[in-house]
Curated annotation (Swiss-Prot):
SUPFAM superfamilies tied to this protein: P-loop containing nucleoside triphosphate hydrolases
Binding site for GTP: 30-37, 57-61, 75-78, 142-145, 173-175
Pfam family, one: MMR_HSR1
Keywords: Cell cycle, Cell division, GTP-binding, Magnesium, Metal-binding, Nucleotide-binding, Septation
List of residues binding Mg(2+): 37, 59
Name this polypeptide is given: Probable GTP-binding protein EngB
GO MF annotation, one: GTP binding
Record has Nucleotide-binding as a keyword: yes
Function recorded in the entry: Necessary for normal cell division and for the maintenance of normal septation.
Gene name of this polypeptide: engB
Domain EngB-type G: 22-194
Upper classification of the organism: Bacteria, Pseudomonadati, Thermodesulfobacteriota, Desulfuromonadia, Desulfuromonadales
Cofactor(s) needed for function: Mg(2+)
GO annotations of cellular component type: cytosol
Length: 207
């Protein structure tokens, strides 16, 4: 897949604020500070398109980005940040739940896992929930540059055991080295492969 353009469209908390559902969407989900914003920036080759922060819990709305004028990437609020008030956590949960259950043009969810952290209940529940909703999931292990290659296998083992997924189901990503970018773009290509007929658009292929 070639990324020719990317722009921020809007933020929204409720369906009434979503952009029109006339383009297919891929959402990005994961715990706070897992690297969703950095991943999107690298995928679209636009440093700073999605604001990144070292402060967990910064993304508090659904953020919509239009790519190639043909599809949307949606940055969902992160979850699991202990210092966020309970009321805010519940609001984020409602936002995400409503979006995933009601957004009919959602084609896939990229679910991120930090290589340095064992999956928590929220991540595993979301993985199960996506399966129940029949939403294709692209699991990605992020921040792989934070551990040595010799330690990588040991670090990913708890993630494989907790999720029950084989290693080949995951993409491995580093915002620093850009490792995994092409692999993830290829998987997005597959997730969007039926949009030409459904939405009447043409997604540019890789050269």
């Amino acid at each position: 897949m070639q990324i020719k353009s990317a722009e921020f469209i809007k933020s929204a908390a409720k369906p009434v604020g979503y952009p029109p559902g006339d383009l297919p969407e891929v959402a990005f989900a994961g715990r706070s500070n897992v690297g969703k914003s950095s991943l999107i920036n690298v995928l679209v080759n636009r440093r700073g398109l999605v604001r990144t922060s070292s402060t967990p819990g910064r993304t508090q709305l659904l953020n919509f980005f239009e790519v190639n004028q043909h599809f949307m990437l949606v940055d969902l609020p992160g979850f699991g940040f202990a210092k966020v008030p309970v009321s805010v956590k519940k609001a984020w949960g409602r936002m995400t739940r409503t979006y995933l259950e009601e957004r009919t043009n959602l084609k896939a969810v990229v679910l991120l896992f930090d290589i340095r952290r064992e999956p928590r209940d929220e991540e595993l529940q979301l993985l199960d929930w996506l399966e129940e909703l029949n939403i294709p999931t692209i699991p990605v292990i992020t921040k792989v540059d934070k551990v040595t290659k010799n330690r990588r296998r040991a670090q990913i083992r708890p993630i494989l055991e907790a999720t029950g997924l084989p290693q080949e189901a995951f993409s491995f990503f580093s915002a620093l080295t850009r490792e995994g970018r092409e692999d993830i773009l290829q998987r997005l290509d597959v997730a969007l492969s039926d949009v030409e007929d459904e939405f009447g658009i043409d997604v540019p292929e890789s050269e």
